[in-house]
């Protein structure tokens, strides 16, 4: 099985190292100094338990790799529309596409038994370009519960969790999800197959849609955001609005809002991905984590004043930093 990992950052690089070490035929698409370091010294993952270094094929040109049996897309959601044509060079009608981006994915409404079946979410897929180039029928959803960062080119530090939940958008069990789960499990990762991947998606997003923008605006880590009553209440109000949208889409949560907030706080002095991106001068996943949720609120007729206000503020902060279009 030929596996191409598009985006060898913290998540993609970790997957590449683990899968390669387990005997899979893995190649990575990377760029810049990170790519140069991988070519020169291999790819390294450090954790409290061990340090692993592997040498594997790496390029910034997808056509050098050719068609893959499985493509794991580990780009940020905001980068995906710009990379879609390059990713498509790895894809045949038989290729399995695994998406790992945070937030609402472009394929969210594919085959969904709802009035909005096959609706294109413009916030993450302007004009339906992703839907066209990366067909949702070939997608396996993957929700990542994992914390790591690239601490220097070619070196990733893994700090928290290693869970990669998998699921077909239509909820069916399939040979491809089962084989992918087995492959990841053999690589030492937790890879449960979920009957409803959207529920898993919303459980992660429920916290992210509030605490990512809050962290970008305040500069605070999640332990401080969840322990300050005023900020906790702000997050709770946003999450209450989002829960009504989720309910309208057939999603119910397995925990209360406060339990979800406490789960976020339990990670400790962790900077959200949005805050990390802001500090490094990189575009943030504003539209996937919050803009798309507000879009779904309008679609389902659920008012979201708190979320809309937060969206305006964090977009303003991003524009001030030159990281969001006017």
Set out the residue ranges of the language-model regions.
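Short internal beta-strands
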Residues: 28-31, 166, 294
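Internal alpha-helical scaffold of NAD(P)-dependent oxidoreductase catalytic cores
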Residues: 37, 90, 125, 129-204, ...
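Rossmann-like NAD(P)(H) cofactor-binding subdomain of soluble oxidoreductases
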Residues: 52-55, 60-151
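NAD(P)+-binding Rossmann beta1-loop-alpha1 motif at the extreme N-terminus of oxidoreductases
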Residues: 1-50
């Amino acid at each position: 099985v030929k596996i191409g990992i598009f985006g060898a950052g913290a998540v993609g690089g970790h997957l590449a190292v683990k899968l390669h070490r387990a005997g899979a035929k893995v190649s990575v698409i990377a760029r810049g100094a990170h790519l140069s370091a991988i070519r020169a010294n291999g790819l390294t993952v450090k954790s409290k338990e061990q340090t692993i270094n592997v040498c594997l094929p790496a390029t910034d040109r997808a056509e050098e790799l050719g068609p893959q049996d499985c493509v794991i897309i580990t780009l940020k959601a905001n980068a995906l529309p710009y990379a879609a044509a390059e990713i498509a060079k790895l894809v045949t009608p038989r290729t399995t596409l695994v998406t790992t981006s945070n937030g609402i994915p472009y394929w969210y409404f594919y085959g969904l038994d709802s009035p909005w079946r096959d609706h294109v979410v413009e916030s993450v897929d302007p004009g339906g370009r992703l839907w066209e180039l990366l067909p949702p029928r070939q997608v396996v959803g993957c929700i990542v519960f994992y914390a790591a960062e690239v601490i220097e080119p070619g070196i990733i530090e893994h700090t928290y969790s290693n869970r990669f939940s998998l699921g077909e958008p239509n909820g069916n069990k399939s040979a491809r999800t089962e084989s992918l789960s087995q492959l990841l499990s053999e690589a030492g990762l937790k890879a449960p197959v979920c009957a409803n991947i959207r529920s898993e998606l919303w459980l992660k997003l429920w916290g992210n849609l509030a605490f990512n923008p809050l962290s970008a605006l305040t500069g605070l880590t999640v332990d401080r955001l969840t322990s300050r009553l005023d900020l906790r209440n702000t997050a709770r109000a946003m999450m209450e609005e989002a829960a009504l949208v989720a309910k309208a889409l057939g999603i119910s949560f397995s925990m209360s809002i406060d339990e979800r907030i406490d789960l976020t706080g339990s990670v400790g002095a962790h900077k959200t991905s949005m805050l990390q991106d802001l500090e490094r001068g990189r575009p943030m996943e504003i539209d996937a984590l919050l803009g798309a949720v507000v879009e779904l609120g309008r679609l389902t007729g659920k008012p979201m004043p708190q979320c809309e206000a937060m969206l305006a503020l964090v977009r303003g902060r991003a524009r001030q930093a030159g990281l969001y279009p006017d």
